[in-house]
Amino acid sequence: DSSLVDGFSVANFLKHNQPEFYKVLTETNVTFKFTDIDTILVDEAKLIELDHNNNFRQIRFSGRLDYVPLLEENNLDLFYKARKYMFKLCNSDDFKIKFRLSKGMIAMFDNLRLLHGRTKFDPNTGFRHLQGCYIDHDVTEGKLRRLLKP
């Protein structure tokens, strides 16, 4: 089964109910790193990214890919508490929908707003195939600007 978590709603909840957590998650850069045989991807960004008007822009969360930020001890404690609480919210049914994709179905979603997850899978019970395709926002926004230009 698959699940989607609304990162915008999680961020908004934090902003209004845990402003100290929201502040540290929107101000602390975290290093994300993925390595395989062909690739080394590294990015430094905030778990909750805001735009220049302090509006929600993106959520990032990967317990396997993010590295400990270099912070003073008291700030690090706050960051970890905030990260743990955000993880709890992301796993809460209050912000998550669950669904099952059948053969031939496709799920399309905004990867900047939504977090995607899958339940554990026992390969002895069947077969699961997931194929991802990603479109960068700047590509689609650029195409939209071109189409709207007189």
PLM region spans:
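Active-site environment of non-heme Fe oxygenases that use a 2-His-1-carboxylate facial triad
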Residues: 1-150
